[in-house]
Swiss-Prot record:
The keyword Signal applies. It catalyses: Eliminative cleavage of alginate to give oligosaccharides with 4-deoxy-alpha-L-erythro-hex-4-enuronosyl groups at their non-reducing ends and beta-D-mannuronate at their reducing end. Its main location: periplasm. The keyword NAD does not apply. This is Alginate lyase. Catalyzes the depolymerization of alginate by cleaving the beta-1,4 glycosidic bond between two adjacent sugar residues via a beta-elimination mechanism. May serve to degrade mislocalized alginate that is trapped in the periplasmic space. It comes from Pseudomonas putida (strain ATCC 700007 / DSM 6899 / JCM 31910 / BCRC 17059 / LMG 24140 / F1). Residues 1-24 form the signal peptide. It is found in: Periplasm. InterPro entries: Alginate_lyase (IPR022859), Alginate_lyase_dom (IPR008397), Chondroitin_lyas (IPR008929).
Length: 367
């Protein structure tokens, strides 16, 4: 099937028409080729839980910031509880797939792989998460889930152990569904005004990038790169993102939250011969350095955002998962490298699981 037959979005069509000549197949960073860590015999104590019910309803969810002012920085406990309840099956799928893929890549037990394929296959057959009846929180859940699933899928797809070789029909079904989700995600997040482009758009672009490589879709890859460039060019000379500064007391936390998708996109682009490191005068490096400095002394963020910073998230090691791809891009040394080593291993289900095993596998053996 040609790229033109698959495209249903004007944004993707434009990229397809002007994307140039044919390219080599898309690939992930080198760490995704790793095989099973240590093949275990027997079933062990792994038990395949029943798959969460495929979510096929409208993607209309309450925001956990419901009722907050325009800074969107104050949690609403009641609406957060409603959000968690209504999205529970989606989050269970994300976390479950990430965990099972991690277990399989560690142990190689067939039951772990079979369960992963059963879960994803049931959602793919149901056409889950494809509703076009959605609000902002709903389309946000769609792209988060897509990034989680495609990020995990990459570890199976490209592993030298070739776990999907004996499951090609199921893999094709799942990848077709991931492609459809990516196409809808492109429609969801294209053509936004600059003042509306923030961390959500970066996470959408990461989910599309992961899917692009998992399904070898150059049109999706090009869209993700385009969105990355928009994000990188939002970083000002001081390393701030104006649309995250608006989050007032959570400005620093949201700068930190913007980094994982941007760093992953740049890493995947580099693996395919597209070097984004210097975009907007090394914006990604500047952003990361600013967050690391802010985590130590948030006074600059307080001055810029006009509020004392909420440091809760900045004390959680896993929130710095972006350090793995970022340090691979910019070759961290000294204090930054030491901080990374102190916090490893990094595991983020929204990035597909154990990012330390992908980017710095020798570090895990030292723990």
């Amino acid at each position: 099937m040609t790229i033109f037959k698959r495209i249903s979005s004007p944004a993707l069509l434009a990229l397809a028409l002007f994307g140039g000549a044919a390219h080599a197949a898309l690939v992930p960073p080198q760490g995704y080729y790793q095989g099973i860590e240590k093949l275990k015999t027997g079933e062990g104590n792994f038990r395949c839980e029943a798959a969460p019910k495929p979510y096929t309803g409208p993607l209309q969810f309450r925001s956990k910031y419901e009722g907050s002012d325009k800074a969107r920085a104050t949690l609403n406990a009641a609406s957060e509880k409603a959000f968690r309840t209504s999205t529970e099956d989606i989050t269970t799928l994300e976390k479950g797939v990430s965990k099972m893929v991690g277990q399989y890549m560690r142990d190689g037990r067939p039951a772990q792989l079979d369960c992963t394929l059963t879960w994803l296959g049931s959602w793919a057959r149901a056409g889950a998460l494809l509703s076009t009846d959605y609000n902002h929180t709903g389309k946000s859940m769609r792209k988060w889930a897509l990034g989680s699933m495609s990020g995990s899928w990459l570890r199976l797809k490209f592993s030298n152990s070739q776990p999907l070789a004996a499951h090609q029909a199921e893999a094709d079904l799942i990848e077709k569904w991931l492609s459809r989700l990516a196409e809808q995600t492109v429609r969801d997040w294209s053509d936004l005004p600059l003042e509306k482009i923030n961390n959500h758009s970066y996470w959408a672009a990461w989910s599309v990038m992961a899917t692009a490589v998992a399904t070898d879709r150059r049109d999706l890859f090009d869209w993700a790169v385009k969105e990355y460039k928009v994000g990188a060019n939002q970083v000002d000379d001081q390393g701030f993102l104006p649309n995250e500064i608006k989050r007032k007391q959570r400005a620093l936390a949201y700068h930190n939250y913007a980094l994982p998708p941007l760093a992953m996109i740049a890493s995947f682009a580099q693996a395919n011969g597209v070097d984004l490191r210097a975009e907007n005068n090394f914006a990604l490096q500047r952003l990361g350095e600013g967050v690391l400095a802010g985590a130590r002394d948030p006074s600059h963020f307080k001055a810029r955002a006009g509020k004392k910073q909420d440091m809760t998230d900045l004390k959680v090691d896993s929130k710095y998962s972006w350090l793995e791809p970022w340090c691979a891009l910019y070759h961290c040394v000294g204090d930054t490298l030491e901080r990374k080593h102190d916090m490893q291993p990094f595991n983020s289900f929204r990035l597909g699981g154990d990012v330390t095993r992908v980017y710095d596998p020798s570090a895990e053996s030292k723990k």
